[in-house]
Amino acid sequence: QVSLKYPEGKMYSFGL
C-alpha cells in the first residue's frame, strides 16, 4: 500500500 500526502491536507492511499 502506498500513501501520498498532498499539501491540501488530504491523504490518498492505494494498493499497487
Swiss-Prot record:
Keywords: Amidation, Neuropeptide, Pyrrolidone carboxylic acid, Secreted. It is found in: Secreted. One of its GO terms (biological process) is neuropeptide signaling pathway. It comes from the Eukaryota. One of its GO terms (cellular component) is extracellular region. Position 16 could be leucine amide or isoleucine amide. The modification Leucine amide is found at residue 16. Its main location: secreted. The modification Pyrrolidone carboxylic acid is found at residue 1. May act as a neurotransmitter or neuromodulator. This is Allatostatin-3. The lineage of its organism: Eukaryota, Metazoa, Ecdysozoa, Arthropoda, Hexapoda.
